[in-house]
């Protein structure tokens, strides 16, 4: 059941590993894709792998990209 909104507000690398979204910033966080309702990328300094984009699409998880002005 998805319930998390993942918000990326600063420099980070987003990737995929074993059905998890991996967020590498100052430290590393992993969130299982089944828990994610939406990914909101508010930073223009974020990097996201194409494989993660593909997996989010397969799981029907929307990705929203915006800048500081929204």
PLM feature spans:
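N-terminal intrinsically disordered, cationic/polar leader segments
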Residues: 1-70
